[in-house]
From Swiss-Prot:
GO terms for cellular component: cytosol. HAMAP family: PurH. GO terms for biological process: 'de novo' IMP biosynthetic process. Signal peptide: none annotated. It catalyses: (6R)-10-formyltetrahydrofolate + 5-amino-1-(5-phospho-beta-D-ribosyl)imidazole-4-carboxamide = 5-formamido-1-(5-phospho-D-ribosyl)imidazole-4-carboxamide + (6S)-5,6,7,8-tetrahydrofolate; IMP + H2O = 5-formamido-1-(5-phospho-D-ribosyl)imidazole-4-carboxamide. This is Bifunctional purine biosynthesis protein PurH. Residues 1-149 form the MGS-like domain. It comes from the Bacteria. Disulfide bonds: none annotated. The gene is purH.
Amino acid sequence: MASDFLPVRRALLSVSDKTGLIDLARALVARNVELLSTGGTAKAIREAGLPVKDVAELTGFPEMMDGRVKTLHPLVHGGLLGRAGVDEAVMAEHGIVPIDLLVLNLYPFESVTVKADCTLADAVENIDIGGPAMLRSAAKNFARVAVAADPAQYADLLVELEANDGQLSAAKRFALSVAAFNRVAQYDAAISNYLSAVADSAEAVPTRSPFPAQINSNFVKVMDLRYGENPHQSGAFYRDLYPVPGTLATFQQLQGKELSYNNLADADAAWECVRQFDAPACVIVKHANPCGVAVGAGCGDAYELAYATDPTSAFGGILAFNKTLDAATAKAILDRQFVEVLIAPDYEAGALEYATKKANVRVLKIPHGNGLNNYDTKRIGSGLLMQSADNRGMSQGELSVVTQRAPNEAELGDLLFAWRVAKYVKSNAIVYAKDNRTIGVGAGQMSRVVSAKIAALKAEEAKLTVAGSVMASDAFFPFRDGIDAAAAAGIKAVIQPGGSMRDGEVIAAADEHGIAMVFTGVRHFRH
């Protein structure tokens, strides 16, 4: 059993990132801690006017092989691994002095290899060998030794030393040990991922496979959740170690109840949909499907139009905006309906003040960022499906008009709007839209024609006029029945991928009804 508090009398410092190094070293020296160090770290400490002993002086071995061998020595690892009450005799026999604190961060492999022009030689030279070995030695012996693997840990470390007369508690040593082992695991995973991706490349700047022979993922827990998708399931939320700027995982919760599994899944769908629009937009999501989407002159206008698509489904929904949410819109929302989550890149002070009247509403702030997710993954039984993320946009110039009548400018704008929305609706997906707002959404049906009929039914329930609207379909129409259903509802233009064996039949149906139709050549299945 580890002693609760143990003094720090000797520390070994060896860091690539020298953030906070001198302040830490100065504080340790002030407590009469003997400093051992290597290479550039020792040089920096010495230049700050602080006493430090080179590890080479301790071991009697110089640094060699351009610094590849510095600390791989029994006098170093024995000093870290020696057990109190067990190994004192053998340590004394071999002249091994105990090291109580290791401060070490690793060669910057991740930041070097993220550069597009990184050569294989550059990558290999930034694979740390002695560093992970020392981290593991110190972390294994947390019963006696403390280890700091990140400059962010220095402040808390010094606070505990100050509060306990130069001693560290067993709880602190254990927590630091876990963090060190996690850091080594992350580091080794980064090396494995990189080398697995370039395994067969002989180029100086190797080509990297998007799907390497082995993948190692690192996620850190953000929070426990009340439960999973259902109350009998447990759940937690983990964030990617390096989250993409602007994605959901970068959120800050400003108020409200704890988030649920379903809250986060729906919030991701809403946020990814709304952030693709440049003009002020609102997306309302229920069960991971947009039930109302609109672009307007401002947030308030966009919300009113999105809400009108399906007021019933909007109850208890997730609302996302791509612009700063103003106080008037926040009041209009919260006075009208029950909301699970509000999402925006920022909020006016008045909006946040009014939101406090509904203390249970979860208010999330997600800073703007242009980053896109690179991959989508899905767990299956004992396996993982991995694909490049569906980041494919669509411009007017990419559309192919396939009918006798071409869409007019207003219809083209609505077609592209509906296409953006359809990308985030579960397949089979049909979206009716007009004037940059959804009129009806048909989602998740096994038959495409049924989705088309549901979209018309939802519009009718909301007392919205389908006549003159456009229709987007996430995949091709296998038969003409979907076009016939759209015509019966009053649809005037259609956007779809094309590619069916019966495209000719579908195009003929559109011509019969005087419908303009464009092909994108891109499918947006979503399961």
